[in-house]
């Protein structure tokens, strides 16, 4: 365990605005919580410069064969797993590109294993099990900024020369001093004292959304604001794929359906084929040459 006293942590402080939350009507109780939640986006906004640095590093790592690995315990670990699990269906990437590791393993997603967070060695073992290397990025998540499991991972990653990021909600935390890039939205005391699944968890989720989304945009997974590498694995996504191609090209549904069928529902390739009027083989050749960036591929043929 670290030596930082809990009573010195912002996330463990008592919130003066909600001291009587147990004595008010339901609507007033919810207003109290909502008023606290309003502070989250502003706290994240103050960290945008640091988030941008992290996004650039992650995007660079992706282009050079690296991965983004989240580590955390409890709520923080679950948020990392959640963000990572959404990347493959949304952006068509492998399940290995963005991974979430939670202290205590997969079972900790559904049942708290709080003691697992106290071991530095456990995180090092978990990272070695996935062959974490110097080309990867490690993002350690902990509201307190003092979780031994995460600190162990950050120290290990630093030791092998990997880029490290900390996502905390306490200023000047131990994690922020260890990581190469510190992201620390200070959301203040929770509505329920110490319940960091609330404001702190919301802030962390917003930051993780930015990290993964920003990196995917930087690596050509988005055209305009359309997710052009999604995998059409169910009926909803099949329809979304059609809409995306229609929106990107202004084409009629009939033409879009024909092209998507020809490309086996490769949304990006379908868009470029329509925009370039090239056949599938030539369009794919130019897209691959431009590393999947539609904008760059269009520039080449203009």
UniProtKB/Swiss-Prot annotation:
Residues covered by the SIS domain: 58-221
Pathway: Amino-sugar metabolism; N-acetylmuramate degradation
UniProt function note: Specifically catalyzes the cleavage of the D-lactyl ether substituent of MurNAc 6-phosphate, producing GlcNAc 6-phosphate and D-lactate.
Protein name as catalogued: N-acetylmuramic acid 6-phosphate etherase
GO terms, molecular function: carbohydrate derivative binding; carbon-oxygen lyase activity; ether hydrolase activity
UniProt-listed InterPro entries: Etherase_MurQ, Glucokinase_regulatory_CS, MURQ/GCKR, SIS_dom, SIS_dom_sf
More about this protein: A lyase-type mechanism (elimination/hydration) is suggested for the cleavage of the lactyl ether bond of MurNAc 6-phosphate, with the formation of an alpha,beta-unsaturated aldehyde intermediate with (E)-stereochemistry, followed by the syn addition of water to give product.
EC id: 4.2.1.126
Catalytic activity: N-acetyl-D-muramate 6-phosphate + H2O = N-acetyl-D-glucosamine 6-phosphate + (R)-lactate
Record-stated family: Belongs to the GCKR-like family. MurNAc-6-P etherase subfamily.
Gene name of the encoded protein: murQ
């Amino acid at each position: 365990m670290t030596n930082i006293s809990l009573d010195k942590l912002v996330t463990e402080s008592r919130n003066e605005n909600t001291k009587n939350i147990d004595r008010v009507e339901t609507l007033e109780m919810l207003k109290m919580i909502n008023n606290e939640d309003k502070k989250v986006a502003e706290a994240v906004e103050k960290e945008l410069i640091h988030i941008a640095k992290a996004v650039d590093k992650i995007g660079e790592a992706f282009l050079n064969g690296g991965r983004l690995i989240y580590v955390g315990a409890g709520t923080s670990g679950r948020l990392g797993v959640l963000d990572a699990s959404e990347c493959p269906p949304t952006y068509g990437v492998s399940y290995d590109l963005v991974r979430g590791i939670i202290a205590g393993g997969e079972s900790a997603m559904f049942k708290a294993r709080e003691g697992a967070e106290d071991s530095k060695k456990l995180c090092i073992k978990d990272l070695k099990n996935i062959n974490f290397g110097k080309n990867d990025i490690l993002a350690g998540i902990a509201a307190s900024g003092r979780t031994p499991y995460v600190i162990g991972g950050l120290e290990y990653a630093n030791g092998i020369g990997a880029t490290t990021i900390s996502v905390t909600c306490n200023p000047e935390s131990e994690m922020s001093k260890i990581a190469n890039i510190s992201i620390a939205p200070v959301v203040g005391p929770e509505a329920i004292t110490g319940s960091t699944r609330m404001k702190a968890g919301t802030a962390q989720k917003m930051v993780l959304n930015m990290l993964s989304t920003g990196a995917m945009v930087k690596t050509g997974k988005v055209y305009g604001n359309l997710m052009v590498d999604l995998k059409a694995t169910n009926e909803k996504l099949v329809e979304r794929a059609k809409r995306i191609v229609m929106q990107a090209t202004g084409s009629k549904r009939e033409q879009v359906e024909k092209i998507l069928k020809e490309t086996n529902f490769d949304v990006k390739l379908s868009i470029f084929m329509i925009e370039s009027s090239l056949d599938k083989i030539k369009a794919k050749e130019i897209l691959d040459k431009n590393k999947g960036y539609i904008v760059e591929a269009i520039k080449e043929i203009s």
